[in-house]
Amino acid sequence: MKEYVYADYSNAIGKFSYNIGLGLENNHYKTATNERFNYLVFRPSVVLNVQYNKHSAMKFTAAINSSVPNVGDLTNSIVTIDEHFYSQGNTALKPYYYYYANLNYQYASDNGKFYIAPSVTYSYYPNKNMPVLFTEGDDIILRMAKIDNVHSLGASLSLNYKPVNWFVIQPFYNYEYSTYRTPNQVVKHNLHNAGIGVQFLPKNWQLMWNGNMPMTLVDGDIHTRMGFNMSASILYKFKSMSVGLEYIYNPNPSKIYADINGFSYSEETKWNNFKNLVSLKFTYYFYKGKSRGHVGKRISNSDKDSGLININTAK
């Protein structure tokens, strides 16, 4: 169960505006072994904006964020991965705070044909819960553990180019440098994530293509390699109905691996149906009565913690 309270204050002075907020979150957990956990965390934040003109703006966000252990990582049960290789929860895990800062710039041309948004992000974790491999006799145990002094520096760039009304190109690039030390190794990782989207929008038609290049994520001692994937779709809209066709190509969804002194392993996801997946969609829209919505005031208190972790989730 989760309770969340949030309050903020906003003001504007000429081209400048700011927002100061404070959130309070209380989490209640009960594991399968009837162990109970109660975590109370604070989430303060500051946002500064400057609107140079109608084409460009800059935003700076600073926050002290928090992360709460999920149920699966707290459960002190053992899952067999392979012979002499196990995963086990850690009941000693605690919530942790981390410092987050982001500087974002946005520019849009007067005619709406060009948009660019570069940003720089830095996060510092005095300590962070990360998956670590431990040697216990002849066995290897994968367990979440507290890792000190985790640094993350990132940059991103997204573009939107619309030379004509019915054609849009949307490339993006993300970079992140992470560094920390586990009991097994010093990690210095460079993440490169790039992709592009193309849209053709002639009259009632919508044709889209998206491609994402391979990338490798790191978390503690564990690396995850995501393969190249792409999708293409065509949609035709007529009055209150639409019919479309989508094609997904994702032959190598992910590969999880680790390599430490005296031990290495890899686990690869193989979903052959995603090598060439085709789906057909038909939609009919109808409305009855009146509806009212306040999109800007909606909040979400949904809790998606199923208690599952990577090790005990079907692949």
Q: Could you describe each region identified by the protein language model?
A:
Residues K237-K315:
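C-terminal beta-signal and adjacent terminal beta-strands/loops
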